[in-house]
Every structure is written in structure tokens, then in C-alpha cells.
Amino acid sequence: MNINKGALIFVDLDGLKIINDTYGHEGGDEAIITGAKILKDAFDEFGVIGRIGGDEFAVFLPNQSDFALSEINQLINDKTIYHNTLIKRNFKVELSYGISLFDQYQDLTVRELLDKADREID
């Protein structure tokens, strides 16, 4: 695969500690699974999704550019709304995320791209 540019998304599951404290680890597990399903539904066809640990995920989108940012935002928002209405639960799953774009001219490691995306979280 020839990758000239792309995007790396750093995703944080909002309020996991509160969900764990209020609904127990079962609720926390359900929130993590739902967060993963949101990302899978949004990006599985053209990206690579991984759980970094705890409440953090990363999504690698090869060959994406800044023109795709609004599409990325829309996908995450649409899938979050869908999964929050699909199953009625006592809490909503919300994601915060930052996007780091790169191209073949940048000399950045994956860690540097993740750190850059983490700083972009809204």
C-alpha cells in the first residue's frame, strides 16, 4: 500500500470514570464497547482502529487529506447519535477526538502523530 498522506485520530471516551462509578464496571465495559462500535461503524471500511488502553482509541486513515476533515467529523457525530439511540441506557456515550494530518514530507513518528492529535482534542 502506497500511503502519501493520511490522518491519525486520537479518541477519548468522555466520562468513563463517572460511568464506572455510577453504573459499575459493567456500565464502563458497555461504554467502551459502544465507543469501539461507533469507531468501527464510522471507519472500518477504510481505516484501522485500535484501543490504546483505558478510554483511549486511535484510528489510522490512510490517504486522507484536510478536505476530508468535515467528513470525518460528520461520520463520528452521526455514528455517535445512532449508537446512543439504538440502545436505551442510563448514560450516553460521547467521544472527544483530535485529528493529526500528515504527508510524505513530514518526518514524524506514530507517537508524535498521536501526541499531536491528543493536543487537538476538543
Protein language model features and the residues they cover:
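Conserved long alpha-helical elements within nucleotide-processing catalytic cores of c-di-GMP signaling
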Residues: M1-A7, D14-D44, G50-G54, A58-V59, ...
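Short beta-strand-to-loop capping motifs
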Residues: V59-Q64, L101-D103
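Cyclic nucleotide signaling catalytic output domains
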Residues: I49, R89-N90, S96-Y105, E112-D122
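Short catalytic/binding micro-motifs of nucleotide second-messenger systems
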Residues: D41-F46, N77-N90
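A structural signal for short, well-ordered beta-strand segments
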Residues: L8, F57, L95-I99
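Short loop/turn elements that form and flank the Walker-type P-loop nucleotide-binding site
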Residues: I3-N4, K92-E94
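Residues immediately flanking
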Residues: V11-L13, N63, Y97
